[in-house]
Amino acid sequence: MAILAHMLQIVGLWIAPLIIFVIKRESRFVSFHALQALLLQVLYLLLIGLGVVFWFGAVVLTMVSSHASGNSSSPPAFFIFMPMLWLDWMSIWGAMVVIAIVYGVKAGRGEWAEYPFLGRLARRILKLRPGGAPE
């Protein structure tokens, strides 16, 4: 189940790790890996949301400035920032896929592998010591 928590986040985003975390709550190993995958998805959604906010802000500012200057042509920010938003999303998703595969393999080997930063947070939430022992 720990492997599934990592691998299913590629297609199931935050839903699959959440379901596994809730169902396998009694297993420290599975809940630790599922919580890490869930925290990664939360971070992923925050980064995507931040990219959308910046893109929307850039488009609005360009439209306001072009309207104020009397220029009625299409705002260039839309055509510049839309591909940037797409590249932002794809690069973050690609990194998430690599992380999911690497840590899914480690979970399959029975390792208590931690995501950078998020692993420590998951350990604190579950009150675990390094290696999975309860505090």
Q: For the regions a protein language model found, what residue spans apply to each?
A:
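Hydrophobic, aromatic-rich membrane-embedded alpha-helical segments
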Residues: 1-25, 97, 118-128
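Alpha-helical transmembrane segments in eukaryotic/viral proteins
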Residues: 4-7, 22, 57-64, 98-101, ...
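Hydrophobic alpha-helical transmembrane segments of multipass integral membrane proteins
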Residues: 7-10, 14, 42-53, 87-104
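Membrane-cytosol interface at the C-terminal ends of transmembrane alpha helices
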Residues: 14-31, 91-112
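Amphipathic, cytosolic membrane-interfacial segments at TM-TM junctions
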Residues: 25-43
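Membrane-helix interface segments in multi-pass membrane proteins
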Residues: 48-94
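Cytosolic juxtamembrane helix at the C-terminal end of the final transmembrane segment
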Residues: 101-130
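Acidic, Ser/Thr-rich low-complexity segments on the non-lumenal side of membrane proteins
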Residues: 131-135
